[in-house]
């Protein structure tokens, strides 16, 4: 069910001109969380627009759910796609790998971009090349 609903959400969100950052479906499928972004920043009106459109589409497609939440990804936005790592080059991120590099799985540093399907991160210890397929989790580090 999740893959089908996620594809439907992706079509609706991108059709409205937004980027689907993340999608969560609760274990029982009762709560749908949709995180959207747009270059200029997400407003409450953007969330309402996407929510209204998804509600209509879910009704037509007979998607069974109790609650729909649409929001921005926040300041600590997750980085999910290779394009995200290119877009946010120059910003500080936290990175968790599925396999350790030098007995370490968690890294913090300035994102340098992407090189040959690897994410380039400048840490205190130097440059780190993290293969994209080994990235378990990555987030922006908010600046205050």
Swiss-Prot record:
Keywords, ordered alphabetically: Cytoplasm, Ribosome biogenesis
GO biological process, any: translation
UniProt-annotated location(s): Cytoplasm
Function: Required for maturation of 30S ribosomal subunits.
Presence of keyword Cytoplasm: yes
Protein name: Ribosome maturation factor RimP
Pfam families per UniProt: DUF150_C, RimP_N
Organism, scientific name: Azoarcus sp. (strain BH72)
GO cellular component, one term: cytosol
Top-level taxon in the UniProt lineage: Bacteria
InterPro entries xrefs: Ribosome_maturation_RimP, RimP_C, RimP_C_sf, RimP_N, RimP_N_sf
Family: Belongs to the RimP family.
């Amino acid at each position: 069910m999740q893959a089908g609903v996620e594809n439907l959400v992706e079509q609706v969100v991108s059709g409205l001109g937004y980027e689907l950052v993340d999608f969560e479906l609760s274990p029982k499928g009762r709560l749908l969380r949709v995180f959207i972004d747009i270059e200029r920043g997400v407003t409450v009106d953007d969330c309402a627009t996407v929510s209204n459109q998804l509600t209509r589409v879910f009704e037509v497609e007979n998607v069974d759910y109790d609650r729909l939440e649409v929001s921005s990804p926040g300041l600590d936005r997750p980085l999910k796609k290779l394009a995200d790592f290119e877009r946010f080059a120059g910003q500080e991120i936290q990175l968790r790998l599925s396999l350790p590099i030098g007995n370490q799985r968690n890294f913090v540093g300035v994102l340098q971009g992407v090189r040959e399907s690897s994410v380039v991160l400048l840490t205190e210890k130097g440059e780190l090349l993290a293969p994209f397929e080994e990235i378990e989790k990555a987030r922006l580090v908010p600046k205050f």
